[in-house]
């Protein structure tokens, strides 16, 4: 009897503990075909792994998970196997006990509405809403790009140019918003993406503005993992090439003999 009571109490305690760490994501969308597969990815830095899948029926989908040890899950919702969707995702932040509702009226998933009590989500939503019209236009181009995979290079190049133009406008709006907001983890994530443009896009026009935003961070933020990644993008180390002049210096071997680099 005691063993049965102990087992029951242990099971009850486990269920209570699990419930305290659970969060749910409930979706209600229109304009999406029944049978559309929805994938939920858990993000760790720039790497994502599939943690759940559901099929949209009558415009609904549902996920239930336990939050990770740090208490905040960064998730990505995608419908990549459907050509009606852009090659983009919906970013979701989840914490224990959060009841998250996702709504949409079309297949433009990146701008579906996420109603959530999680503060990181609320802050992230501000960036999306600030450029909602541009993001929708960008997604429509992304969907069109799927149908042009076999089109002539000139046509695909023209489409990419339109995407780049819209992306630049989004960056401009985001930087203006970032000037008004306090520095936070979400803020730094946006700065990281801007720093990637500085590093890899030779046509990116806002390097000085990005550097000014970087200088808003305090030392603790600059020395964080994200802060260091931003710095590497903005201030890449100089690579010495063959033929470049090097500063000479004296080096001593174990026998005390002097050697020079040049």
Model-derived segments and spans:
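Alpha-helical repeat scaffolds
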Residues: 205-216, 244-249
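Amphipathic alpha-helical repeat scaffolds of TPR domains
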Residues: 180-198, 228
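Short coil/turn connectors between adjacent alpha-helices in alpha-solenoid helical repeat scaffolds
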Residues: 160-162, 198-207
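Bacterial Sec-dependent N-terminal signal peptides
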Residues: 1-27
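Alpha-helical solenoid scaffolds that mediate protein-protein interactions
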Residues: 170, 177, 194, 217-218
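N-terminal "domain-start" segment that seeds a small globular fold
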Residues: 228-260
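A non-transmembrane, solvent-exposed segment enriched in polar/low-complexity residues
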Residues: 19-165, 169-172
């Amino acid at each position: 009897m005691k063993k049965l009571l102990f087992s029951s109490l242990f099971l009850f305690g486990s269920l209570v503990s699990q419930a305290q760490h659970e969060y749910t994501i409930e979706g209600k969308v229109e304009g999406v075909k029944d049978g559309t597969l929805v994938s939920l990815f858990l993000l760790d830095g720039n790497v994502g792994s599939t943690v759940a899948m559901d099929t949209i029926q009558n415009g609904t989908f549902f996920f239930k998970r336990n939050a990770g040890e740090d208490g905040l899950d960064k998730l990505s919702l995608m419908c990549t196997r459907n050509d009606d969707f852009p090659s983009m995702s919906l970013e979701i932040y989840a914490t224990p006990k959060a009841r998250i509702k996702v709504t949409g009226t079309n297949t433009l998933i990146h701008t579906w509405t996420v109603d959530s009590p999680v503060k990181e989500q609320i802050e992230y939503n501000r960036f999306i809403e600030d450029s909602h019209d541009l993001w929708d236009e960008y997604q429509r181009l992304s969907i069109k790009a799927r149908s042009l995979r076999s089109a002539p290079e000139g046509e695909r190049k023209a489409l990419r140019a339109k995407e780049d133009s819209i992306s630049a406008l989004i960056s401009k709006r985001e930087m203006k918003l970032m000037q008004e907001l306090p520095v936070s983890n979400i803020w730094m994530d946006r700065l990281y993406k801007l720093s990637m443009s500085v590093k890899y896009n030779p046509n990116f026009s806002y390097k000085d503005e990005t550097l000014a935003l970087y200088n808003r961070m305090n030392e603790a933020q600059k020395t964080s993992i994200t802060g260091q990644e931003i710095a590497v993008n903005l201030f890449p180390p100089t690579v010495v090439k063959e033929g470049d002049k090097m500063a000479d210096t004296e080096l001593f071997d174990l026998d005390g003999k002097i050697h020079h680099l040049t």
